[in-house]
Amino acid sequence: MSKDKVTVITSPSTEELVSLVNSALLEEAMLTIFARCKVHYDGRAKSELGSGDRVIIVKPDGSFLIHQSKKREPVNWQPPGSRVRLELRENPVLVSIRRKPRETLEVELEEVYMVSVFRAEDYEELALTGSEAEMAELIFENPEVIEPGFKPLFREKAIGTGIVDVLGRDSDGNIVVLELKRRRAELHAVRQLKSYVEILREEYGDKVRGILVAPSLTSGAKRLLEKEGLEFRKLEPPKRDSKKKGRQKTLF
């Protein structure tokens, strides 16, 4: 097997596919597959995605992403720390398992158009200015910009099929979900916040609050917030560079 930075095989045989996938996992390289596939997810919920052409990316940290030919976000994904393996069934199946909470993502590879292994070296960190990441850091440094007694606990917390920007508790012990926007917030942001709150309320009841944090919001977003019983906090993204990493605490 070549040890070049990149190894690419188009229309690989099953043996070539197995060899490249195992090589990527063993070498902790980045694996990319263009394929026609089906996807099955089993975890807190269940979902099925029928046959279609997609891009599958497996990163050295265990991140597992499945992209369609539209939208920015993956249609299915698993977070860092997940374990990945290839199983030979009727068709080859990529399996990603998250241990806690237990979640399994299976991708049946019906036809593989291309598989690549990228032996990437990248040790830099991104310094974001005026972004949602900077807003989150400001909130961790000064929680009272949200409200007195607010205690932020998690950043980028996986909830269902999405990621909450900041998760914490208020002075009354309620769980608080923060959806951060560095620009004017629109209806989509409210709907996203609503979905996170609904997921958490299924488990924790009414002791869950949702707060949209942004410099401003549209009139439609304001009406929907009020209708859904959600809240708004005005906050401008800070204009500074930072690479600090906040320590995350436990929610319970």
UniProtKB/Swiss-Prot annotation:
User: Where, per UniProt, does this protein localize?
Assistant: Cytoplasm
Q: Name the UniProt key words of this record, in alphabetical order.
A: Cytoplasm, DNA-binding, Endonuclease, Hydrolase, Nuclease
Q: Which is a Gene Ontology cellular component entry for this protein?
A: cytoplasm
Q: Which Pfam families match?
A: NucS_C, NucS_N
Give the matching InterPro entries. Endonuclease_NucS, NucS_C, NucS_N, NucS_N_sf, tRNA_endonuc-like_dom_sf
- According to its UniProt record, the EC number is 3.1.-.-
Q: Which GO terms describe its molecular function?
A: DNA binding; single-stranded DNA endodeoxyribonuclease activity
Please tell me where this protein is predominantly located: cytoplasm
Relate the protein's function as given in its record: Cleaves both 3' and 5' ssDNA extremities of branched DNA structures.
| Family listed | Belongs to the NucS endonuclease family.
Annotated protein name in UniProt: Endonuclease NucS
Organism lineage reads as: Archaea, Methanobacteriati, Methanobacteriota, Thermococci, Thermococcales
**What gene name is given for the protein in this entry?**
nucS
